[in-house]
Amino acid sequence: MAVPKRKKSKSRRNMHRSHCKLKVPNIGIDKTTGEYKLSHHICLGGYYNGKQIVEVDSNI
């Protein structure tokens, strides 16, 4: 069984885990509705980049 020769220091341990972190979502404000939305996603009103892409039923 493989066993490490020397103890990994706290610094090297943390550097090894540097990619294991949470990313902050890229949130912006929609131009048409003024609501928050994820970048490069359609807002709940069906708008993308100021243009209506999808017809949204208002009964929902």
Curated annotation (Swiss-Prot):
In the UniProt record, the signal sequence range is: none
Molecular function (GO) terms for this protein are: structural constituent of ribosome
Q: Alphabetically, which GO biological process terms does the record hold?
A: translation
The protein's matches in InterPro entries, at most eight in alphabetical order, are given as: Ribosomal_bL32 (IPR002677), Ribosomal_bL32_bact (IPR044957), Ribosomal_zn-bd (IPR011332)
Instruction: Kindly state one GO CC term assigned in the UniProt record.
Output: large ribosomal subunit
- Pfam families registered for this protein in UniProt: Ribosomal_L32p (PF01783)
Q: Which UniProt keywords apply?
A: Ribonucleoprotein, Ribosomal protein
- What NCBIfam families does the record point to? rpmF_bact
What HAMAP family has UniProt attached to this entry?
Ribosomal_bL32
As for family, the record states: Belongs to the bacterial ribosomal protein bL32 family.
Name the chain's protein: Large ribosomal subunit protein bL32
The organism named in the record is Ehrlichia ruminantium (strain Gardel)
Q: Which gene encodes it?
A: rpmF
